[in-house]
Every structure is written in C-alpha cells, then in structure tokens.
C-alpha cells in the first residue's frame, strides 16, 4: 500500500530541497519526522509538512498503521522560475531568478 502527498510551487530551490530529501529517503516515518524537526534548513520544515500530510492521508484514506510506515519515495523537481530585475550602475539591470520546486512524497509499508 502506498500513499502520496504533493506540494507544488514551493519557494525553495530544487537543489536545496534535494539535500533534505536525500536524508530521509527510505527511513521510518517517525525517524524521518524527528530528523526534520531538528534540521536547521528551510527545506526541512517544508518537507516535514508534506510528510505529515502523506502520513495523514495513509491513516485516513487507507487505515494504515503509522508505526509501520516508511518513506518509500521522495523527490524534488524543478518548478517555474520567477524572473525579477534589480537596478545596477549606469542604467543597467541584472536578472534575479527566484527558484521554486515541486515536492512528491510517497509512504508505504
């Protein structure tokens, strides 16, 4: 049995999100939540929210036992880029790229 949770359009770069996702892939959900709770990274709080949603989906929709769940798959894909400009010297402008990503979490036993 597998249950999914998806969060799209997160204002976090995919590279920074993958650093956190790689740490919890394949772990039991209680160990993964504990690791995410004490991680100082911005992506940890966001991924924790998605993981909690996947756990709630498994419990409510499939009647799964939380103690037996583990993170089957987790991946972070590139999302749309917001392009902004900032003023520079002599009338020039530089582009600022604000990255976003999509987070996909699957839990199962």
From Swiss-Prot:
<comment type="similarity">
    <text>Belongs to the universal ribosomal protein uL22 family.</text>
</comment>
<dbReference type="InterPro" id="IPR005727">
    <property type="entry name" value="Ribosomal_uL22_bac/chlpt-type"/>
</dbReference>
<keyword id="KW-0699">rRNA-binding</keyword>
<dbReference type="GO" id="GO:0019843">
    <property type="term" value="F:rRNA binding"/>
</dbReference>
<keyword id="KW-0687">Ribonucleoprotein</keyword>
<comment type="function">
    <text>The globular domain of the protein is located near the polypeptide exit tunnel on the outside of the subunit, while an extended beta-hairpin is found that lines the wall of the exit tunnel in the center of the 70S ribosome.</text>
</comment>
<dbReference type="InterPro" id="IPR047867">
    <property type="entry name" value="Ribosomal_uL22_bac/org-type"/>
</dbReference>
<dbReference type="GO" id="GO:0022625">
    <property type="term" value="C:cytosolic large ribosomal subunit"/>
</dbReference>
<comment type="function">
    <text>This protein binds specifically to 23S rRNA; its binding is stimulated by other ribosomal proteins, e.g. L4, L17, and L20. It is important during the early stages of 50S assembly. It makes multiple contacts with different domains of the 23S rRNA in the assembled 50S subunit and ribosome.</text>
</comment>
<dbReference type="InterPro" id="IPR001063">
    <property type="entry name" value="Ribosomal_uL22"/>
</dbReference>
<comment type="subunit">
    <text>Part of the 50S ribosomal subunit.</text>
</comment>
<dbReference type="GO" id="GO:0006412">
    <property type="term" value="P:translation"/>
</dbReference>
<protein>
    <recommendedName>
        <fullName>Large ribosomal subunit protein uL22</fullName>
    </recommendedName>
</protein>
<keyword id="KW-0689">Ribosomal protein</keyword>
<dbReference type="GO" id="GO:0003735">
    <property type="term" value="F:structural constituent of ribosome"/>
</dbReference>
<dbReference type="Pfam" id="PF00237">
    <property type="entry name" value="Ribosomal_L22"/>
</dbReference>
<keyword id="KW-0694">RNA-binding</keyword>
<dbReference type="InterPro" id="IPR018260">
    <property type="entry name" value="Ribosomal_uL22_CS"/>
</dbReference>
<dbReference type="InterPro" id="IPR036394">
    <property type="entry name" value="Ribosomal_uL22_sf"/>
</dbReference>
């Amino acid at each position: 049995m597998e249950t999914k949770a998806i969060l799209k359009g997160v204002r976090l770069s995919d590279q920074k999100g993958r650093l956190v996702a790689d740490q919890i892939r394949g772990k039991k959900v209680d160990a993964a939540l504990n690791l995410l709770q004490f991680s100082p990274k911005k992506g940890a709080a966001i991924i924790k929210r998605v993981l909690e949603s996947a756990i709630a989906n498994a419990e409510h929709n499939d009647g799964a036992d939380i103690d037996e769940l583990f993170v089957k798959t987790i991946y972070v894909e590139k999302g749309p880029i917001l392009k902004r400009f900032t003023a520079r010297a002599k009338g020039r402008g530089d582009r600022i790229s604000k990255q976003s990503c999509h987070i996909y979490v699957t839990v199962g036993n």
